[in-house]
Amino acid sequence: MLHRAFSVFLFDKENRLLLQQRAPSKITFPSLWTNTCCSHPLYGYEPSEVDTPEDIANGAVPGAKRAAVRKLFHELGIPRKEVPVSKFKYLTRLHYRAKDEFAVNQSMAGGPWGEHEMDYILFIKPGVPVTIAPNPDEVNDVKWVNREELRAMMDPSSGLRWSPWFRIICDKF
């Protein structure tokens, strides 16, 4: 089922990107490396995390940005005050579908899981060091990388596995 999502790319003052490795206990895409934070805006939250067509058309997407702040705290322990909504930049939306090949015991047999998302791409450069305290139920590891380090990590010879949305975003942008 098509649903909304967001992907956060958090950069430090040196333009390094914060990556996370998803926890091995995650139902979908366990242990894969990906961008800083990925999740979904939730209906029923106040203030709202669901954007109106007007918000989307004008590029404001305040709901997706509020959801991103919520999940940066939940997944990575980054305090809300360190990633204010006003610092987020909305780049675009990406529609994609991906089957999770490793969802069942991380075997190639795969499982019934996957994603069909309209993914809002959000960049943030807070301008101050951020506090990171990963939630072990969500995150296995984190790493700050520059462009060259990211390229080396994404090289197939590295043996690292990547989330499909992150690979698509890196290929397209």
Predicted regions and their residues:
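Short, conserved, surface-exposed binding loops centered on an aromatic residue
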Residues: 9-11, 82-83, 110-114
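Nudix hydrolase/Nudix homology domain
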Residues: 37, 43, 89-173
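Poly-acidic low-complexity segments
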Residues: 63, 84, 134-135
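Conserved Nudix-box catalytic region and its N-terminal flanking loop in Nudix hydrolases
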Residues: 1-78
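Short, structured loop/turn "capping" segments at alpha-beta junctions
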Residues: 78-89
